């Protein structure tokens, strides 16, 4: 049987964590990644070179590569001294390869091949873009990193230039997908930013593949303050122009006082789930008692193994293929 074609849409840490888990399964992975980041090492490079943001792309390439390889470790290495302090070597390699090939998309393909990744990593657009936001009070905020600093409710986000075209490979992947997964990650700056690229939303909506949203566990200050799971989904649907999400994976776990206090100090709290409200809109809600893990310093994160297994199980419900058996359970 052919492998299931799973397309991931997003950016930031969330997408790379999910990709790292899914690479262990017998699926054909394509990650469509936002290129609107303008902070940190990525921002410095973009100030010098007018290229799409390399940072989120770098993280996903590393996640899909052989995690034990020296090349993969080198790709994620970050300098700490002198004039290149703060720069990731992977970002510099992407920038250098872009100069060599004169094409950001070609640079990503070349580096993906060098690192022997499982699957494909595709920028949502091959154009250098800036993400802006219109706040509910009408103020326009320019640049991704400035959006959450305003601590205002976001009405919508948009890209400059506004006529950017998608990577054709991204459109083809959406058309051919068996399952499309959005998130987890910053709602507006990592997920919805991809839908701002002309053609992405249309291809997503018209794809025959079921669509799944992986909800964040905690609200994000300055971006999703007070948002429920449904609020996250509603924001995605507003950008796309119509409802399309069929499944949502979300946490219903309760957290101890230490965890809640740590997040309250950052003006963040658990994303609330109203299962009946979601099911009323024909969204199939998937949860797990151990979807989230808590670190020693009381930070909550998706359990990579549990999340990727849930996504694969959903895919198996939809597609006839050979079930995956972990190597330690094979006879």
Language-model regions: role of each:
Residues 127-188:
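Active-site gating loop/helix substructures
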Residues 2, 21-27, 33-50, 166-167, ...:
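Conserved phosphate- and dinucleotide-binding cores of soluble alpha/beta proteins
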Residues 13-14:
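Hydrophobic/small residue at the entry helix of a nucleotide-binding pocket
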Residues 8, 31-32, 213, 250:
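Structural beta-sheet core signal
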Residues 36-152, 308-316, 325-330:
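Electropositive, gly/pro-rich neighborhoods at or near active sites that engage anionic ligands
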Residues 74-103, 185-189, 218-224, 255, ...:
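Glycine-rich phosphate/diphosphate-binding loops and the adjacent beta-loop-alpha structural elements
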Residues 226-331:
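C-terminal functional extensions of proteins
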